[in-house]
Amino acid sequence: MKEFKIGLLLLTLIIAMLYFTEKFTSNNDIKPVRNLAYESNEELKPYINKFFRDLNNHGINKSIPKDFIFKFSDLESNKTTSHYHGVSLGHDDDDKVEIYINKNSWSSFNKTQRYYIVYHELSHDILNLDDLSENEANYGKIMYPSISKYDNLKMNDFVKNMKDLFKSL
């Protein structure tokens, strides 16, 4: 019984250490992303407005939270986010949206990819959805994690996948 209690105590300590290490690391990773951000409302606003219109058209009544940040950021300048196209920081917090889009990715993306990245990141923060696994069956879906692979998809593909996502909720 004593060995069980010691094992349980060690397991609890390990879990606590992992939790606080992740929490501390995540906060340190976020600061540079915020510092590298800049205003981009005019370019992103039409995509954001379309997302909320599409939600409403599919019977999903979500409003824009008061704490709403959606900006471009030089994510490639930060070692921990250099390979990200976008970062969503308001997942599981319905009162907050905090999203940063890699400006270089945005510049290289076609129109369809731009819609995918905006809907993908907003689906994390507004709908609290997780990424899908990166396998062939999920290719084309909004929550697929590799938007850069969507350079051959057209707006019709996006519209179909957006409707499929919203109907599944």
Regions found by a protein language model. Name each.
Residues 19-30, 129:
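Signal peptide cleavage region of secreted peptide precursors
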Residues 82-111, 125, 140-148:
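Active-site scaffold of zinc-dependent metalloenzymes
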